[in-house]
């Protein structure tokens, strides 16, 4: 199985491929690693999203850290192999020639792979409702793509959607800037990928928020002749940040356009017209059938193409619940602090952290 950073280092058509592991990963992959007695950690930093804060593995599991970085090779008391990943695996292959794992272990992996296929199929299927889910769009882009094509994303909900629902057809055909979730990388990164890859199409999936952060490289790609296909998924705001707000007990605040617009305003962006003004071939769709047809036209286009579609703001592909991650929630929020200032209870010049800490103690 793979991490987010390692996605497309394996081909998804392998009978024992069980998907990505971790908090944003698939239950199928986590079911495999939870029973492993030996894990080869190849080139991974073993951070919390990958390991579920170290809750995914059996406590007695032995790790072998194969990494060019000594610090990462030694993590979690791994047996460190500080070396090039490819060369190490080639050497291990020679040493293990003729050896094979128990057939029951292979059968377990094959069964988990079938579980992954069933899950992904359930997410990408057309349910006849508009707007579509992210997963349905990912499924149609995947159907359109070939083994030579490249898919890219960065911020918002799309990393999670592609991590689970994208089944890689080619090696090194996937890029997700998830180290910092850098909003706008979807456009600039796709332009760079188009420069670097003379064969195949470059697909980039971007949310409306990231599009607004950085979009001028659409013009740059048209100007330089490096074609890319940009799918703009408009959820009418910053839906993933809003999701994080409310999932920890907070109230939705200033992330969705409907909650942020001033009185009497309807400040919506015409993404199709905006992209067209930068020279791109553009399409706006209102059904999954239209989206599929737009993908065909975008592939045939002689320059950068932008497909604009609405998307559901609250329909995300959940990562495996067995993958644990802790995000703390404030006992007293800054929203309450602001309210207390307005009521004259606190002075706006005071340090809110000190007072919030005092209030938290009072609540306890």
What do the predicted segments below correspond to?
Residues 33-36, 140-147, 194-199, 297-301:
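Glycine-rich phosphate/diphosphate-binding loops that line cofactor/substrate pockets in enzymes
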Residues 22-29, 33, 81-85, 89, ...:
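Generic structural signal for well-ordered, non-membrane alpha-helical segments
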Residues 6-108, 299:
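Glycine-rich, acidic loop regions that bind phosphate or pyrophosphate groups
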Residues 1-4, 64-67, 230-234:
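Short internal beta-strands
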Residues 12, 113-188, 193-194:
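Active-site diphosphate/adenylate-binding microenvironment
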Residues 38, 150, 201-203:
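Structural motif
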Residues 18, 23-24, 57, 73-74, ...:
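Thiamine diphosphate
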Residues 6-7, 38, 44-47, 69-70, ...:
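Short glycine-rich anion-binding loops that position phosphate/pyrophosphate groups of nucleotides
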């Amino acid at each position: 199985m793979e991490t987010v950073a390692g996605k497309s280092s394996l081909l998804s058509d392998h009978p024992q491929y069980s998907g990505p592991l971790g908090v944003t990963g698939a239950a199928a992959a986590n079911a495999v690693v939870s029973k492993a007695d030996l894990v080869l950690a190849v080139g991974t930093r073993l951070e919390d999203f990958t390991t579920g804060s170290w809750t995914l593995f059996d406590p007695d599991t032995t790790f072998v850290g194969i990494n060019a970085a000594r610090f990462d090779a030694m993590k979690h008391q791994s047996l460190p192999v500080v070396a090039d990943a490819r060369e190490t695996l080639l050497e291990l292959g020679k040493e293990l020639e003729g050896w094979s794992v128990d057939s029951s272990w292979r059968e377990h992996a094959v069964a988990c792979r079938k579980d992954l296929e069933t899950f992904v199929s359930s997410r990408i299927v057309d349910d006849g409702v508009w707007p579509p889910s992210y997963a349905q769009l990912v499924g149609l882009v995947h159907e359109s793509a070939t083994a030579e094509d490249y898919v890219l994303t960065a911020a918002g909900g799309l990393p999670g959607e592609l991590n689970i629902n994208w089944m890689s057809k080619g090696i090194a055909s996937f890029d997700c800037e998830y180290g910092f979730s850098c909003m706008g990388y979807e456009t600039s990164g796709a332009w760079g990928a188009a420069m670097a890859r003379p064969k195949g199409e470059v697909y980039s999936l971007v949310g409306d928020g990231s599009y607004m952060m950085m979009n001028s490289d659409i013009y740059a790609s048209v100007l330089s002749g490096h074609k890319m296909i940009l799918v703009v998924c408009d959820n009418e705001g910053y839906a993933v940040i809003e999701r994080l707000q409310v999932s920890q007990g907070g109230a939705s605040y200033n992330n969705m356009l409907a909650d942020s617009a001033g009185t009497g305003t309807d400040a919506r962006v015409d993404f199709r017209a905006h992209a067209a003004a930068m020279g791109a071939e553009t399409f706006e769709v209102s059904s999954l059938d239209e989206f599929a047809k737009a993908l065909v036209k975008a592939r045939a286009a002689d320059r950068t193409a932008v497909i604009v579609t609405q998307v559901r703001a609250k329909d995300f592909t959940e990562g495996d619940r067995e993958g644990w991650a802790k995000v703390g929630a404030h006992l007293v929020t800054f929203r309450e602090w602001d309210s207390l200032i307005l009521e004259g209870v606190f002075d706006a010049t005071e340090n809110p952290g000190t007072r919030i800490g005092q209030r938290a103690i009072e609540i306890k």
